Amino acid sequence: MAGPEGFQYRALYPFRRERPEDLELLPGDVLVVSRAALQALGVAEGNERCPQSVGWMPGLNERTRQRGDFPGTYVEFLGPVALARPGPRPRGPRPLPARPRDGPPEPGLTLPDLPEQFSPPDVAPPILVKLVEAIERTGLDSYRPEPPAVRTDWSLSDVEQWDAAALSDGVKGFLLALPAPLVTPEAAAEAHRALREAAGPVGPALEPPTLPLHHALTLRFLLQHLGRVAGRAPAPGPAVRALGATFGPLLLRAPPPPSPPPGGAPDGTEPTPDFPALLVEKLLQEHLEEQEVAPPALPPKPPKTKPAPTGLANGGSPPSLQDAEWYWGDISREEVNEKLRDTPDGTFLVRDASSKIQGEYTLTLRKGGNNKLIKVFHRDGHYGFSEPLTFCSVVDLITHYRHESLAQYNAKLDTRLLYPVSKYQQDQIVKEDSVEAVGAQLKVYHQQYQDKSREYDQLYEEYTRTSQELQMKRTAIEAFNETIKIFEEQGQTQEKCSKEYLERFRREGNEKEMQRILLNSERLKSRIAEIHESRTKLEQELRAQASDNREIDKRMNSLKPDLMQLRKIRDQYLVWLTQKGARQKKINEWLGIKNETEDQYSLMEDEDDLPHHEERTWYVGKINRTQAEEMLSGKRDGTFLIRESSQRGCYACSVVVDGDTKHCVIYRTATGFGFAEPYNLYGSLKELVLHYQHASLVQHNDALTVTLAHPVRAPGPGPPPAAR
């Protein structure tokens, strides 16, 4: 067996010593076995990766620094390691213990494997879902990097009483209590290769079959939660790095084994100790980039009046799938997510299946605030969600479940198909009939939106401040507890010694020394009482402030629907004005946006002279976010580029706003290019760029107070003017 001098293994289960030469194991222990020891056992080259087939193995437990034998059925292979170890001592044959997979986990050590905790269509283990839901109800708090305390009770019966810190510790403790890391060593090695080669997103490397299905589902659920945590932070960048540092070691538990090149020789690119943190940081960045679409969906619109279908009893033909308002044909999953965003449970639509197989469709249903994808099967002219297929058409299938609960098909989906997303939506819901009247009403709604936004921002600042103060008070209470413990120990020692000295001075008749000892004892008791009183007062303040903090969070949550609704209404009016030909300068006045000084391009007499007509001045092809930010570094506001997005079939616009680079997705739909419905109206990227050369992006995102003014490769605009 040539190659490395030894190999590392990680314990999956606890093992108690049966013989003096045995090693005791705890889950997560790293064990080192020398190559010479495996050669002495007759292990063939390559079989060291399958410790369960080796049997008893001699090695070193790096946690306890003890040597001994351990069962190969209790460990998993990590990778090669360089070492210089003495050879094995001879030992006789010995039967292996049974692999402890089927029995209940030892309290406080391990949980069942993920496949034993949940199964699709559930998206994650119930314990983790319960903890995450409790955290997001309590208020998204920062995860602390400290390791969690060992938990022996996972019933979570009192989870509603936990504060944010205890809940976040619960999530971390859950990940540590799993019998195997959420990201398996094999998947971590694939992710490391993708991260090292920088050939594209790392996320696909952590999908089945590389990562087991239940692990992949749980990882996706956790990343969605952490994405919301990072998105809630005032500065997402530092929050992503902090979450990576906290959760990287929990998800991988150890760096992955190095992945050798095809030739088999090491290439010097072994994972660094900070790889777990970098991997989680990269996954969160990719998740946030997928969510970087700024504009929310418009509210549901009433369907156009259509003649009612003629009943079969009257000799008419059955309703066609193409005529069904809820059937959208060949649209992407991203478009479906956009149409169902912020809709109530029971909202649904049907599209062609992504498999493109004739007769197969996908029903997307809103349930529990998430989109549930249900496949519609087809065989021999019949349709259904599962065998037996009993419906003669998709229309019959959907009509049935508009009146009957989907719990007949899946107990988790206890809802009917209540609210179809209609493709026959009117384009506007604006009651005014003149541009000036609509503009005046737009100004009112925009002002209301800004007022609510300011109120929300003030509440968020107050919530952040009080959360920090609460953490300081908790730390102070812990300090009080330690101080009380020290003083009480001192009091016990003093009381023990005082009895001896009091008896001695009483015999000697030394009243003065007796009074001094008694006075010191009273002072110490008084001081302990003062500290107890201070701690009690601080605990009362903590409870009161925690209650106020929860009230602030409730007020913030109550403002969110108002903000979303006001923004949707405002967007309706913006679309109406744009389609009626209102000038952007006038729209900016209604929105209270100051029209900036004319730049060199707006002074051009002929719009045909704009550099925007040359795609090479702004289209840069396939580059990533970091490369785009480097190209735009130091450029003036309004400098932009268009690149391919990490989302398949989409593009991304990167633009400088207030000296910082912002990114937003450009969708390509059946109606054209655009940043969101109903703005996907442009026949080409060039048409979109020319429109937003004079139209502000603020109508899509309040933070994008800029136009696409300066193509990044166009001559002329340089760096921003130096500060005076």
Curated annotation (Swiss-Prot):
Any one biological process term the GO annotation gives: regulation of autophagy
Modified residues (Phosphotyrosine): 460, 601, 651
Name of protein: Phosphatidylinositol 3-kinase regulatory subunit beta
PTM note: Phosphorylated in response to signaling from activated receptor-type protein kinases. Dephosphorylated by PTPRJ. Dephosphorylated at Tyr-651 by PTPN13. Phosphorylation of Tyr-651 impairs while its dephosphorylation promotes interaction with FBXL2 and SCF(FBXL2)-mediated polyubiquitination. Ubiquitinated. Polyubiquitination by the SCF(FBXL2) complex probably promotes proteasomal degradation of PIK3R2.
Taxonomy of the source species: Eukaryota, Metazoa, Chordata, Craniata, Vertebrata
Pro residues bias: start-end ranges: 87-98, 254-264, 296-306
Entry keyword set: GTPase activation, Phosphoprotein, Protein transport, Repeat, SH2 domain, SH3 domain, Stress response, Transport, Ubl conjugation
SMART domains membership: RhoGAP, SH2, SH3
GO MF terms, alphabetically ordered: 1-phosphatidylinositol-3-kinase regulator activity
Occurrences of domain SH2 (ranges): 326-421, 618-712
InterPro entries the UniProt entry points to: PI3K_P85_iSH2, PI3K_p85beta_SH3, PI3kinase_P85_cSH2, PI3kinase_P85_nSH2, Rho_GTPase_activation_prot, RhoGAP_dom, SH2, SH2_dom_sf
Subunit (UniProt): Heterodimer of a regulatory subunit PIK3R2 and a p110 catalytic subunit (PIK3CA, PIK3CB or PIK3CD). Interacts with AXL. Interacts with FLT1 (tyrosine-phosphorylated) and FLT4 (tyrosine-phosphorylated). Interacts with NYAP1, NYAP2 and MYO16. Interacts with FBXL2; PIK3R2 is a substrate of the SCF(FBXL2) complex. Interacts with PTPN13; dephosphorylates PIK3R2. Interacts with XBP1; the interaction is direct and induces translocation of XBP1 into the nucleus in a ER stress- and/or insulin-dependent but PI3K-independent manner.
Purpose of the protein: Regulatory subunit of phosphoinositide-3-kinase (PI3K), a kinase that phosphorylates PtdIns(4,5)P2 (Phosphatidylinositol 4,5-bisphosphate) to generate phosphatidylinositol 3,4,5-trisphosphate (PIP3). PIP3 plays a key role by recruiting PH domain-containing proteins to the membrane, including AKT1 and PDPK1, activating signaling cascades involved in cell growth, survival, proliferation, motility and morphology.
